[in-house]
Structure formats: C-alpha cells, structure tokens
Amino acid sequence: ESSFAEKTFAVFPTLVFGGNLGKKSKYPVSYLTSGLKEIGKWLWLARFLKLDSKFHFIHANDIAQICGFLIKNHKEEQYKGFRKFVLGQKFISIDDAIITLLKRHNMRRFFAIPLTKKILKILLRILPIQTTPWDSFSIKKYDFNHVPITNPETFKLKSYAKSLNDILRLSKLPSCNNN
C-alpha cells in the first residue's frame, strides 16, 4: 500500500451544471448549463413525451465543496484510504425534469406518450438520426441511478444546488428566473 493511499480519493461527478448565462462571469459555464439556452426550442415537443429514465446531476460549486472537505478531512478515520465517490444529487426522472422545465416556461402538458427503451431503439433505426457511441451507451444503460450517491449533505454540508429548480434559478436563464 502506497503512502499516498490515505490521502487519495477519486470523484466521479454525474451530470455537471455550473456558471450562469445572464452575465460575464469569472467562472466558466458548463456544457449542460450552456445547453439550457436550447431547451426552449424543443420543449414544445418534449412535453408530449414521457421518459422514466433516471439521472443524477450536481453543481460545480457542490463538487468544489466536497473536494475541499475531503482534502481537509482525509486524516479522519472514516475517510482514510483510497475512496471513490460518485457525486450527485438524488436522482430525478427525465419526465420530472420535463415537468419542471414546463412549469418554468409557463407551458402545459395535455398528454404524454411513453417513450420506452424499446420504442426509442426502433425510432433510432427508422429515423435519420445519427448517434454517438455515448448516445448508444446511454440508451442501452437507460437508467443512471447510482447507489450510493455523494452530495454535500453526506458530509453534513449544505448543497449549493440541491434541485433542478435551484439549477435553473442559478443559471440566470431569463425565462427560468420566475420562482
């Protein structure tokens, strides 16, 4: 065992949000946060689909908070040795995310067609849609629910962005700042 083992930890962030879209910032905007600008173009269509696939997300501030805590407290007994942490908030379904976004954009859902894994695979075969290897992996995996999941509350800290509503508010996307 290496002398570095007790000081070593690995973090595996789930989907990372961070930065804001409303003004210039000294911090970069994450790929996912920058993608929030595109949601309005597709939300009208997404509201008619129901996807139960689950995922976790985490804000960059929460990642920094957890890493800072682990660096300062690596000598404590419960954190000794090489540790692995999957970082994220409690999972939400894609459908829950769509509903949250619809509320933020003052849109309604009248009905939704369940888009199962099987239907999704068929659509990808018959429609002229190109998928990347990551897209294909994600469709096969379908659910990205990790156990255990680590967030600031794991260490008795307070999350900067615990919910998707927090993410939308902090992103400073103009249509998403109506609490």
What are the functions of these language-model segments?
Residues 8, 47-50, 84:
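Short, functionally important structural connectors and interaction interfaces within domains
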Residues 43-60, 125-148:
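Low-complexity, charge- and small-residue-enriched intrinsically disordered regions
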Residues 31-58, 66-69, 78:
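A conserved pocket-lining segment of Rossmann-fold NAD(P)-dependent short-chain dehydrogenase/reductase
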Residues 10, 54-57, 91:
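Short aromatic/basic micro-patch
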Residues 24-29:
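Acceptor/aglycone-binding surface of glycosyltransferases and processive sugar-polymer synthases
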Residues 62-133, 151-179:
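Mid/C-terminal beta-alpha module of Rossmann-like enzyme folds, strongest
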Residues 1-23:
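Conserved beta-loop-beta element that borders a ligand/cofactor-binding pocket
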